[in-house]
């Protein structure tokens, strides 16, 4: 617990912060959006035409990766990264720790005293980091140390900047020698492929031509911000990311006046800097606002392919922490850092698209929308049969602590359709008395 003197010192430090006035804004520049991403446009600029076409067919159409183009892609990626100031590269992956991992290697490959910057196709496609110290969920013993990172071309490489340099980050999957998933990305890629195959099979039953299946996601990110002076005086926050004891404030969220309230200048400055960093990485941060609890806020992006959206969310959390530190703040991403007020969820706005058709869009007359009703029924059955797997996928000490305590979602898996869709399903399922005709197009 903070003593009166340390609390007074912390408040004095906050009170002495310079107040920034309102200045004339310069014209808006957005030409830096995605500047640090090895995007489709960059590929077309740096790669031979045939190589770019082959790589894009893997990214956009899901065709198997042609290993013969790896050397050309690696060379182009290296040239682009060097021009952007990167001296190192890393296979960026997501072990079962809830965060990301990376091991940096320099491009430097000297021949005698002659410095040469090199990056081979093998360096791009695969790496062998030691996996013995990463959690495996009981899949293997510690002495089974070998692990492999494999390039995921469907998520573009990007440049991560720091104080005096930059690193080329290559998104990768992480697995064992026997193919067991040691990360979060591998199961996601496998499930995306399985769902895509099932959707194509279903659409074939409706007589639709073969189209690309896209699983879209827009993960909202909630977070708390507190001044670093208060944070450093709370060992529980420093060690666990949440408070373990303390007295509730006289006023917290009873008046519901913080939600969507006017954003304080210090916080708004922080948000602006966060968005600039996100936009450089091609992350479509769209919405920012005060959340329900005091000192709680939210950042929401536009929808993207689910694999890319999750990679972007990992970067969002990292950038929130980094920018908070630069503003004399600490960003708390624990799901329940304070008792008695809302915790921080990560609401996932999820959908399935077939070509340009959103399969979860009911349209103006859902009762006549056979495709929508079929997909909806399949999702309801899947949740009913596999709620244990869904619940397990979001189970963690922090999230289990949050669910059911001053939160909107309960601790169980459930579906709420609303009265209109609920009545629609009840009506169409009443086959004994009434039958309706459905236009299959």
Which positions does each model-derived feature cover?
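Active-site core of metal-dependent hydrolases
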Residues: 31-145
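Flexible, glycine/charged-enriched surface loops at secondary-structure junctions
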Residues: 66-68, 206-217, 285-289, 330-334, ...
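ATP/Mg2+-dependent ligation/transfer catalytic cores
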Residues: 147-275
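Short, conserved phosphate-binding/catalytic loop or strand-edge motifs used
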Residues: 221, 291-299, 344-346
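Short, hydrophobic beta-strand segments
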Residues: 255-258, 297-306, 350
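Catalytic or ion-translocation cores adjacent to nucleophile or general acid/base/metal-coordination motifs
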Residues: 262, 312-315, 319-333, 340-341, ...
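Polar, glycine-rich mid-to-C-terminal structural blocks
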Residues: 374, 378-425
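Conserved small/polar residues in nucleotide/adenosyl-binding loops
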Residues: 427-436
